[in-house]
Amino acid sequence: MAPATRVVRALWTGGCALAWRLGGRPQPLLPTQSRAGFAGAAGGQGPVAAARKGSPRLLGAAALALGGALGLYHTARWHLHAQDLHAERSAVQLSLSSRLQLTLYQYKTCPFCSKVRAFLDFHALPYQVVEVNPVLRAEIKFSSYRKVPILVAQEGESSQQLNDSSVIISALKTYLVSGQPLEEIITYYPAMKAVNDQGKEVTEFGNKYWLMLNEKEAQQVYSGKEARTEEMKWRQWADDWLVHLISPNVYRTPTEALASFDYIVREGKFGAVEGAVAKYMGAAAMYLISKRLKSRHRLQDNVREDLYEAADKWVAAVGKDRPFMGGQKPNLADLAVYGVLRVMEGLDAFDDLMQHTHIQPWYLRVERAITEASPAH
């Protein structure tokens, strides 16, 4: 297949895998793998709701119901096991972060990858970065899960693959607070297949915004139940709404689309021919796709207005009495929103956002907090 054809095919079928993983068609669903993602600590198949003939809506509802039951099962199992874990822990532990060797497979300009980097940097977790070629994706040929980010965590003799940005963050935060083995933690976030209302197969992960902590551990992280609920709500908002405003804004005009792909090519891992093709053909394709996304998500004629409204809604939720939603330091919602917005830096959409909303002071505070905490990696 010619390089030009491969690039165009990646642009269309991969959509936002090449850019901000938001354009074009949804990523094709790939089989759940053993020991990779959340198929179970023993390496067996994870819980799967198989697609069957019939109503897509009913299939989706049935799969989600099964997922809820599985989530309750895993949560209950965790509650029983947590007491034993707590009793076994030494009063003086080795630094948990030093026991992990982390490798992040990413596209630098992907907002989901940016979320994970923001989390890792703020929590001073050293990690290696492998930039994935968005056309060939040879760097992740070891994985049947073909989206990024993928995080491989080596803990002693145990190696775990974590998929989905929100699951990666929740699992690692649980690990840092509780000290539970990562191999055990990832079983609390089971992968589930379902069919959505459009008849497309999708993979979801149970409990992905929830930290698996006992009551004492939760009190170390949250000031109360309301703070925990608030964090979960806004983490999901970042994934379900904010992230979908990026592509329509950065590809809003032909000029902006070209500038965006110039940045993607410079920051990404492209060959010379692939980069040249991606810059011009990718910009043209994503400009057209951005119009479809505008319609799909029912955005205003001027998509900037939706971006501005989202930013000001977030600022209002943080409020005037605390520097971050997490209080005196960023919580997981702060890091998620920051990570999504950061991918627009250097583009007109980002400059307009800073100029026309009240988000800049908060954004700079998070940036400073991450910079001060971040190790060299």
From Swiss-Prot:
<dbReference type="GO" id="GO:0048471">
    <property type="term" value="C:perinuclear region of cytoplasm"/>
</dbReference>
<keyword id="KW-0333">Golgi apparatus</keyword>
<keyword id="KW-0643">Prostaglandin biosynthesis</keyword>
<dbReference type="GO" id="GO:0020037">
    <property type="term" value="F:heme binding"/>
</dbReference>
<dbReference type="InterPro" id="IPR036282">
    <property type="entry name" value="Glutathione-S-Trfase_C_sf"/>
</dbReference>
<keyword id="KW-0963">Cytoplasm</keyword>
<dbReference type="GO" id="GO:0000139">
    <property type="term" value="C:Golgi membrane"/>
</dbReference>
<feature type="domain" description="Glutaredoxin">
    <location>
        <begin position="90"/>
        <end position="193"/>
    </location>
</feature>
<keyword id="KW-0444">Lipid biosynthesis</keyword>
<feature type="topological domain" description="Lumenal">
    <location>
        <begin position="1"/>
        <end position="57"/>
    </location>
</feature>
<dbReference type="Pfam" id="PF13417">
    <property type="entry name" value="GST_N_3"/>
</dbReference>
<keyword id="KW-0275">Fatty acid biosynthesis</keyword>
<dbReference type="GO" id="GO:0042802">
    <property type="term" value="F:identical protein binding"/>
</dbReference>
<dbReference type="GO" id="GO:0043295">
    <property type="term" value="F:glutathione binding"/>
</dbReference>
<protein>
    <recommendedName>
        <fullName>Prostaglandin E synthase 2</fullName>
        <ecNumber>5.3.99.3</ecNumber>
    </recommendedName>
</protein>
<comment type="subunit">
    <text>Homodimer. May interact with CEBPB. Interacts with EXOSC10.</text>
</comment>
<comment type="similarity">
    <text>Belongs to the GST superfamily.</text>
</comment>
<keyword id="KW-0472">Membrane</keyword>
<keyword id="KW-1133">Transmembrane helix</keyword>
<dbReference type="GO" id="GO:0005739">
    <property type="term" value="C:mitochondrion"/>
</dbReference>
<feature type="modified residue" description="Phosphoserine">
    <location>
        <position position="95"/>
    </location>
</feature>
<dbReference type="InterPro" id="IPR010987">
    <property type="entry name" value="Glutathione-S-Trfase_C-like"/>
</dbReference>
<feature type="binding site">
    <location>
        <position position="148"/>
    </location>
    <ligand>
        <name>glutathione</name>
    </ligand>
</feature>
<feature type="domain" description="GST C-terminal">
    <location>
        <begin position="263"/>
        <end position="377"/>
    </location>
</feature>
<feature type="binding site">
    <location>
        <begin position="164"/>
        <end position="165"/>
    </location>
    <ligand>
        <name>glutathione</name>
    </ligand>
</feature>
<keyword id="KW-0413">Isomerase</keyword>
<comment type="pathway">
    <text>Lipid metabolism; prostaglandin biosynthesis.</text>
</comment>
<keyword id="KW-0597">Phosphoprotein</keyword>
<feature type="site" description="Cleavage">
    <location>
        <begin position="87"/>
        <end position="88"/>
    </location>
</feature>
<dbReference type="InterPro" id="IPR034334">
    <property type="entry name" value="PGES2"/>
</dbReference>
<feature type="transmembrane region" description="Helical">
    <location>
        <begin position="58"/>
        <end position="74"/>
    </location>
</feature>
<dbReference type="InterPro" id="IPR036249">
    <property type="entry name" value="Thioredoxin-like_sf"/>
</dbReference>
<dbReference type="InterPro" id="IPR034335">
    <property type="entry name" value="PGES2_C"/>
</dbReference>
<dbReference type="GO" id="GO:0016829">
    <property type="term" value="F:lyase activity"/>
</dbReference>
<keyword id="KW-0812">Transmembrane</keyword>
<keyword id="KW-0644">Prostaglandin metabolism</keyword>
<keyword id="KW-0443">Lipid metabolism</keyword>
<feature type="topological domain" description="Cytoplasmic">
    <location>
        <begin position="75"/>
        <end position="377"/>
    </location>
</feature>
<comment type="function">
    <text>Isomerase that catalyzes the conversion of PGH2 into the more stable prostaglandin E2 (PGE2) (in vitro). The biological function and the GSH-dependent property of PTGES2 is still under debate. In vivo, PTGES2 could form a complex with GSH and heme and would not participate in PGE2 synthesis but would catalyze the degradation of prostaglandin E2 H2 (PGH2) to 12(S)-hydroxy-5(Z),8(E),10(E)-heptadecatrienoic acid (HHT) and malondialdehyde (MDA).</text>
</comment>
<dbReference type="GO" id="GO:0036134">
    <property type="term" value="F:12-hydroxyheptadecatrienoic acid synthase activity"/>
</dbReference>
<keyword id="KW-0276">Fatty acid metabolism</keyword>
<dbReference type="GO" id="GO:0050220">
    <property type="term" value="F:prostaglandin-E synthase activity"/>
</dbReference>
